[in-house]
Amino acid sequence: MKKQRNLRSMAAQAIEQVVEQGQSLSNILPPLQQKVSDKDKALLQELCFGVLRTLSQLDWLINKLMARPMTGKQRTVHYLIMVGLYQLLYTRIPPHAALAETVEGAVAIKRPQLKGLINGVLRQFQRQQDELLAEFNASDARYLHPSWLLKRLQKAYPEQWQSIVEANNQRPPMWLRVNRTHHSRDSWLALLDEAGMKGFPHADYPDAVQLETPAPVHALPGFEEGWVTVQDASAQGCMTWLAPQNGEHILDLCAGPGGKTTHILEVAPEAQVLAVDIDEQRLSRVYDNLKRLGMKATVKQGDGRYPSQWCGEQQFDRILLDAPCSATGVIRRHPDIKWLRRDRDIPELAQLQSEILDAIWSHLKSGGTLVYATCSVLPEENSLQIKAFLQRTADAELCETGTPEQPGKQNLPGAEEGDGFFYAKLIKK
């Protein structure tokens, strides 16, 4: 039996690691969830994701409720108060229980002398809630995005930035990809129905299913057997443009965690696939995904800027470059991105993308296809990146995705329930 732990203090410490130390919630949360009971896993996740989704609001409220911020060794208390405010604002947890558990969290983080302070701040919020929220809703902080990102979205999408921001602040739907080598989408949907769950097919992507209500993967028919994979619909769209064929040599570059590698092999089971990523941890997940789906690919660790180090002079029929990016299209799925990214990251990422594109182009056969993809919504990483590449690369031709003046296809967050995603299909003359 797992030891009873204070979830509020665990959430506060995790959020502090994200905001103060720049760590990814995707790395921090799973080990923490192993320490709590199954019924508490979901609540711990809700508290972490929820606070990070609404961080700017909670920060704004604390600044109104407290004379000065908590600093130094007491900084965790700042995040514990955030967890308390989030529960009062956004959950169905009875207020008395939310307060009691949050105040008790001070003991778990070895700050019992601050229980009274935490209790006082949260009770003050309860008394002034209507007045504070009215003031908050009249401020720019209501968009729940850092100002640098808000400015970039407003500049890039003067007519659509508000709908993008709104979509980013929602909980994402759960999308699945049916493994066509095992089942047709319709036959798997019938199995889902028999299991008492509902799913809906995507209009454009032939393997995509949206669950009516998100569910744990172990509850999905045939998940362990590889019949289905969790993958957003927009990410599945890459295969529409890549169109892999049996017998081809295909490179999946920046392949971790392996969702697109396995999708290539579902569409073209006899393709020769090389999956490459610079990150060892992400590569381990590529191996895990291949194993679960019973598939084989060559997997290598390598830097996309120096392909000769990991593939020599090899040429490929098709290349999928899922480029490292700001991930500004998947904020609803990873709300910590809002607080991990900085404005200065964008030109640095654009430079890295440019270097990888130039380096890998020489490894594409004449007549071959390269699909450039990102989960960003920022033009510097997307349309402007491809426009510049086309201008400096004489043998590159845009195909099916946009125009030379406005290259690529940009999906915005929430459009057709998918994540924000960009694709450009390039042919080598």
From Swiss-Prot:
Keywords, sorted A to Z: Cytoplasm, Methyltransferase, RNA-binding, rRNA processing, S-adenosyl-L-methionine, Transferase
EC numbers on record: 2.1.1.176
GO cellular component: cytosol
InterPro entries: MeTrfase_RsmB-F_NOP2_cat, MeTrfase_RsmB-F_NOP2_dom, NusB-like_sf, NusB_RsmB_TIM44, RCMT, rRNA_ssu_MeTfrase_B, rRNA_ssu_MeTfrase_B_ent, RsmB-like_ferredoxin
Any one GO MF annotation of this record: rRNA (cytosine-C5-)-methyltransferase activity
Subcellular locations according to the entry: Cytoplasm
Protein name: Ribosomal RNA small subunit methyltransferase B
Organism field: Escherichia coli O6:K15:H31 (strain 536 / UPEC)
